[in-house]
Amino acid sequence: MSTLKVGTIQDHANSITAMTIDSSGRILTPARPLFSAYRDSSGVEGLTGTIVFNATRSNVGSHYNASTGKFTAPVTGNYQFNFVGMGSENSSGAALAASTAVYATLYNETTSTNLARGYAVVNGQTSYPNLSFSSIQPLSANDVIRIDVGSRYVYSDGSDIWLLFSGHLIGYL
């Protein structure tokens, strides 16, 4: 049996670190594509159509575009995406009316395919229903992914906690 002892694995030509192993044995992959985006607004609003999450907490590899709200897969692989949002009645961010439905869709713009959907119907009192979902999707390099909202709106305000979109590469196919 052989033992390979390394602390860092780098690209031979450019010295780009692909992986490190820390003193506790944890594997770190600093070049793995990931993003965490949110909607930064000046006040309460309701949004529909393609949602532009215009600010990021992290964007490793810069594959998420905060101007368009779109993520472009840099490589073919399995990706996990997460969406957090609440339904809203209108562009003013009002609570969704009773007996009303709203949905948010993870959409592959390149293949014109709906990949996942969060759906809510308000039964009874007016409220802000949860539209959150998580999905693992196989993507090809250069697939463009976005969140679309239909039927009504999603709620956003001046905080960065109500409307979130994130994703990361799990592994290559």
Model-derived features with residue positions:
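Extracellular jelly-roll beta-sandwich "head" domains, especially the C-terminal globular C1q domain
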Residues: S2-G7, D11-I16, S24-L173
